[in-house]
Amino acid sequence: MMLIKIAWRNVWRSKLRSAVVILAIASGLVGGLFSSAWMNGMANQRVRDTFSIETAHIQFHNPEFADNFDVKKTILATKEKLEELLKTQGVKAVTSRLKTPAMAATATKNMGVTIVGVHPEKEMEVFGLYKKIDTASGEFFNNKKKNSIVISKALAKELKVKLKSKIVLTFQDYNGEITGAAFKVIGIYKTTNSVWDKMHVFVKDKDLRNVLELPMDQSHEIDILLHDYNQAAIISNQLQQKYPDIISEDWSKIQPYINFITKYMDIMMGVFMLIILGALGFGIVNTMLMVILERTRELGMLMAIGMTKRRVFVMIMFETVFLALVGALFGELISMLLINYYGKVGIDLSSMAEGLEAIGYRAITFPELDSIRYVQITIMVFVTGIIASIYPAIKALKLDPANAIRTI
């Protein structure tokens, strides 16, 4: 206990030098933690948007459907499967979809798209696309009008259409014949992924089924939303065994990039912080070497009157750790305030919106960091302080008391 008190007082003997070191540590941690929170917020947003808009957590397909979107390769007995899936533990909601490639045409332009036929009520339980349509941009199949279509803002701009405009969709039906129909635009959505937006249009299941001449109780896709997306792989494997005639894929297989984000973001953040702490560690070592040089005579006197080398080593280690922890405390406090503030108001990157949306990220990002990260950083700083104290302490132990006392 006495060594701890002495070490704490020694830290503040040179207030300016200690303050500079503490400020350097705090600045490094603020930069590292805020950058980590920013990256983490962007990654989590991308993951949430993917589940909510694009993939759900698990998808069923006919094994041959994914090869070329052949409309004949369907999932049979869809209604029965949906009812059974809802009873499966861990499943929150399910819906079925029709999918077919098509050509969307207006008077000005043609574009290739994927038509998605949906059951509006079930679709809204699994996906959040309806939330991406603001009040001025129409609705998501709230009316019972026939041949309605919801398209993206990006596609509407390309095709030069607006609400109540008509789009002609041409595609191959169940019998292999080229067919098509005109659909009226009732809603225009905008997600954070402009590339995905341009490729997908949404119509009612019954409208598309009629034109496709697809038999009832058959679908191209079943989407499953879980209570916990971390259980997707386990539940998907169980469902694959239960339904061997279909392919059950969890989100990590459907979107490998999202799987990479969730798996390696923690590792990337850890490496990032290690680099910062490594640089700060060298700064601490340099400072403590200066301290040893300035206190050569004092250390020599302490050893001359009987302080053991072990106690000298521990005292210097405590001084180094105190410097590191005080810097960490200030750094984490400032980081917490910044992250909480920008986590509410967001960081506006509107100047780069087009580029960010092309890869599926929002123009306004919200930093977020789990509380456990602060505990982990504190431990890492503590360990850094101990490691940084070793070399200066060894230098102090090599001092000869008789020569050290005579040092001016």
Residue ranges and their predicted role:
Residues L289, R297-G343, Q376, T384:
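Transmembrane alpha-helical interface segments in multi-pass membrane proteins
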Residues Q172-M269:
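Mechanotransmission and gating elements of multispan inner-membrane complexes involved in transport
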Residues V30-I58, I339-G346:
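Alpha-helical transmembrane segments
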Residues P63, K73-F202, K206-M216:
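A structural signal for hydrophobic secondary-structure junctions
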